[in-house]
Amino acid sequence: MRFSILPIALLASTVVADGAAILAAMTKISAATSKLNGTIADFHGGLIGLGETIPILIQSTTLLNDIKEGTKTADASAELTVDETIQVAGATSNLVAGVQSSLKTIVATKPEFDELLVISPVILINLEQQKSATDKFSKAVVAKLPEQFRSIAEGLIAPIDVAFDDAIATYKKFF
């Protein structure tokens, strides 16, 4: 009889870990966003900048993969508790600020990217892919929140869409 309790205890610990797993994914995405932001901010442009585009592209791809992995984590999670929801809300606020800052840096650096001709179109493609992945991640996380918090969460993440739309519109001007 003692063994029959063990699977239930393991299941309970798995559900408790879901909030932590989503938070870990958000932390990873925030760190990748911050790293990319720093690399883009240090971009010099011109021929010197050509070599600097490789780390930008690698970090951008890493960020995209982290977002996709975060979506898988959120999709696999059970509904979050109220306490987990509060923690996710705090992490979301930090992530929104980081994404907005990064996208502002990307927009500000566009003239330097334009000098290299081929870089701005690649950045545009990356922005569109990251926006799509971010939308999926956001929807997956919001779906795991208790119903009464979902509309609030959608309001918290709305500035990300605005920032992406602005950055994408700026990069579309290249064509």
Each PLM stretch: what is its role?
Residues 1-20:
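Fungal secretory targeting signals
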Residues 18-175:
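Mature, structured extracellular domains of secreted fungal proteins
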